[in-house]
Amino acid sequence: PIMTLGHFGGSTGDAALVEVLFSAGMLAGSGILAATGGFRNKSLTMVAAIAGFGVVAIASGLLGPSLFAVFLPASFLMGACSPLYAGTQTALMQEQIPPEYLGRVFGLYGTIMAWAMPMGLAAPSVFADLLGAPLWFVGSGATMVLLAMAMLLAPSVRNVGKRDTGRIQ
């Protein structure tokens, strides 16, 4: 909403449309993941999703105020990247963690995510209010691309997603 209302000068209806398109993208990304299973190496699916989201976020941040119509499909694409990462990460955890620990690991993971979410929403709001939403999109997108590159360069990350690897002992 900050990008739509502030940078593009849109209405609350425009902000709702962006959210609907992001959600539709999530459904499409989920369908793609369900139909294909992602790349053979699951970690590459996660890397591609992070990099894809980052590239589209950078492009969105560079859009001029009159290019709201371009932001709409970009929102769809960012939404499509989300389940490609999250769904693949969940599948990797289920494959790699011994069943007797899986419930505890998912419980801890859920707790950490629930704790981090308010902070993850508050920090960007403050940043966007101070420096503008476009700069936040560019900065966070660049960070995501760098993270994806670091993941791709790390042998431990590249190898964990291979279908022929065993469980973590």
Language-model features: where?
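C-terminal transmembrane bundle of multi-pass solute transporters/carriers
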Residues: P1-Q169
